[in-house]
Amino acid sequence: MPPLSRRELLAASLAATTVSSLALARSRSQPGKKRDWHAGEFRRMVALGESTTAGGWSTNASRCWVSVLGQMINDFQSTRMDVINNGIGSNVISTRSPCYKHSGKPAANERLQKHVTDLKPDLLIISYGLNDARGGTPLELFQAEMTGVIRTIRKSINPLILIPSPYFMTDFRAGGQPWTKANLEIFHEYGKGIDTVARAENCLFVDLLEASGHASWTVHFDGIHQSDLGHRIVANRMFEVLATHCTGLARHTKLIEKGAPRWRNESKLKADYGY
């Protein structure tokens, strides 16, 4: 058989690429192929984090993202999930963080037993990065410490773990000199680094910086914490990630939707135009 010309080789290569692309598109469009991260309803959610997790300066406890997320999940479950907020202001990931001495203690890696494993959650949110970035923790050290926290937890329990990026904030001079070592670019690098840890450690990642749209009016007047609106955006994005990865959040809806009463009535709207 004579060798193929350059034109024939190019045509064959393009044809193979087209077939491969079509096959990939078909596989992506086929239902039922996506991984299900949690097939049952959640029983207990624990949020481990810093001041925004604790509530920041939301106008009341029910407007904190932890409470809002818990309400959203419970709205779609037949059985109520317990919600436990273990946020501490100025908290950091580890005793090895350079800003540890200025932080709210104990650090995350010091408080895993009483604040996580003893509680036996099946949904765990570990929200760190904002204070470590502001306090000068090198990203590589932060990633190593976050990985250590996740692996320590999984020696005892195996919850679904969700880890978000830092929250959006506007005043990188606030909080005093120990907390002035970050900017928005560093926050985005942290977000990428946290995503890398999530992929390596079998966790779900939530990009809160992207969710914020960099809208300054979602931030509290102190320039650091989320406003009530910001807390709602955080909860919404976390719920979106959970709902699109966990079939357990659809179980109750799937059970009741076929027998639900048909409540829609557009007859007046049609009658307005003679139909």
Predicted features along the sequence, with ranges:
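N-terminal secretory signal peptides and thylakoid transit peptides that target proteins
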Residues: 1-16
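Ser/Thr-centric signal marking residues that sit
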Residues: 5, 52-53, 165
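Boundary at the C-terminal end of the N-terminal hydrophobic targeting segment
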Residues: 23-25
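Serine-esterase "nucleophile elbow" of acetyl-processing enzymes
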Residues: 27-89, 96, 112-120
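Acidic/histidine-rich helix-loop elements
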Residues: 57-58, 86-107, 134, 223
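Alpha-helical cap/lid subdomain in secreted, periplasmic
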Residues: 71, 77, 103-259, 263-266, ...
